[in-house]
Design a protein with these regions (language model features):
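PRPP-associated nucleotide enzymes
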Residues: 1-208
Length: 208
């Protein structure tokens, strides 16, 4: 079964408090989303394998360790975009892709309307990004789409998750670990996590 890792680092939790605060403006909110993604990514790659190489320093040659595999990022539109920028700041070589999904109003099944994944994604470790993991339907569908394209190694990063979403990922994708800053207690009928962060896309871009 996939594991849920809640990052309780004081810096992560301090930034989470600012994200939750309704008084935080859009500019600050966007910056915090990116910063939080960087911190979650830092935690998630802790156990990744490295390989040894040599680099030239100003005074000679040094043995160094670098990540063994390429890392790719797939942001779920639209709120995941802010997280992707944060991870690219941490790992500049990370390739960025996007998946857009909407729910069919009759069947409630997720429908893909946009999908652009990194070239050779099947050879990378892919981070799927969405600030909120509520019911888990969109996240689970996006992960399935990636697997159908040959991606084998996937980690899901979010800022806040709900139990329902975690359980769905664990049931449908037991090989996908989840990294988050908080596990909240409830989900509204409209699919919002409580207390949550509100509508992350709207708060990031100042829309309603």
């Amino acid at each position: 079964m996939s594991s849920l890792f809640i990052n309780d680092h004081p810096l992560v939790q301090s930034k989470l408090a600012l994200l939750r605060d309704v008084k935080t403006n859009s500019k600050e909110f966007r910056e915090l989303v990116g910063e939080m993604a960087s911190l979650l990514c830092y935690d998630a790659v802790r156990e990744f394998k490295t390989k040894t190489t040599e680099v030239e320093t100003p005074f000679g040659t040094a043995e160094a360790n670098v990540l063994e595999r390429e890392i790719g990022v797939v942001a779920l539109l639209r709120a995941g975009i802010g997280m992707a920028e944060g991870i690219q700041n941490m790992i500049p070589t990370a390739k960025i892709g996007h998946i857009g999904l909407y729910r069919d109003p009759n069947t409630l099944q997720p429908i893909e309307y946009f999908c652009k994944v990194p070239k050779d994604a099947e050879n990378m470790h892919i981070f799927v990004l969405d600030p909120m993991l509520a019911t888990g339907g969109t996240a689970a569908a996006a992960i399935q789409f990636l697997k159908e394209r040959g991606v084998k190694d996937i980690t899901f990063l979010c800022i806040v998750c709900g139990r329902e979403g975690v359980q769905k990922i664990q049931a449908e994708h037991p090989d996908v670990d989840i990294y988050a800053a908080a596990l909240d207690s409830a989900i509204t009928e409209d699919g919002y996590i409580v207390p949550g962060l509100g509508d992350v896309g709207n708060r990031m871009y100042g829309t309603k």
